[in-house]
């Protein structure tokens, strides 16, 4: 499975860049109904996990684009 999410304009909407992983996890879990682990004790955790297994991900950022790519 490979999932690409266009985040263009997303940086202007959030007050803290460090919150991006947490907001993405919430989106993946609540909107896309994916089984993504969220640690409420560590909202700034950048690892993306499903059932304790770490998933491969990367950000693609250029002057014109901002994408998040998740591979399982």
Swiss-Prot record:
<dbReference type="InterPro" id="IPR020248">
    <property type="entry name" value="Y03I"/>
</dbReference>
<protein>
    <recommendedName>
        <fullName>Uncharacterized 8.5 kDa protein in mobB-Gp55 intergenic region</fullName>
    </recommendedName>
</protein>
<dbReference type="Pfam" id="PF17595">
    <property type="entry name" value="DUF5491"/>
</dbReference>
């Amino acid at each position: 499975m490979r999932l690409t999410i266009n985040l263009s304009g997303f940086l202007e909407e959030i007050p803290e860049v460090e919150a991006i992983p947490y907001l993405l996890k919430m989106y993946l879990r609540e909107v896309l109904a994916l089984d993504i682990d969220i640690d409420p004790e560590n909202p700034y955790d950048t690892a993306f996990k499903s059932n304790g297994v770490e998933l491969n991900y990367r950000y693609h950022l250029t002057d014109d684009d901002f994408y998040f790519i998740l591979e399982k």
